[in-house]
């Protein structure tokens, strides 16, 4: 998921993506705590995807405020 793809989405779609990513991050942290996580790098990619979505949402909010 790159920033350009995210910028083409509506704010509602971005919020849905954000909820989905946060749920996935929670599940990955839970798996890590119980020792069931096999792909540790997935935590980092999900966390960065959350940051990307939040950045684009903030850009859209700032753009709408102007």
From Swiss-Prot:
A Gene Ontology term for the protein's cellular component: cytosolic large ribosomal subunit
Swiss-Prot/TrEMBL keywords: Ribonucleoprotein, Ribosomal protein
Statement: the UniProt record of this protein carries the keyword Metal-binding: no
CDD domains: Ribosomal_L29_HIP
Gene3D superfamilies, per database record: 1.10.287.310
Stored Pfam families: Ribosomal_L29
Top-rank taxon: Bacteria
GO biological process: translation
UniProt family annotation: Belongs to the universal ribosomal protein uL29 family.
Naturally occurring in which organism (per UniProt): Ruegeria pomeroyi (strain ATCC 700808 / DSM 15171 / DSS-3) (Silicibacter pomeroyi)
Protein name, per record: Large ribosomal subunit protein uL29
GO molecular function, one term: structural constituent of ribosome
Gene: rpmC
Organism lineage string: Bacteria, Pseudomonadati, Pseudomonadota, Alphaproteobacteria, Rhodobacterales
């Amino acid at each position: 998921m790159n920033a350009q793809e995210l910028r083409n989405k509506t704010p509602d779609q971005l919020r849905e993506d954000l909820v989905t990513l946060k749920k996935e991050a929670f599940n990955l942290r839970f798996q890590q705590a119980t020792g069931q996580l096999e792909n540790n790098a997935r935590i980092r990619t999900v966390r960065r995807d959350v940051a990307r979505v939040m950045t684009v949402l903030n850009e859209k909010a700032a753009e709408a405020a102007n």
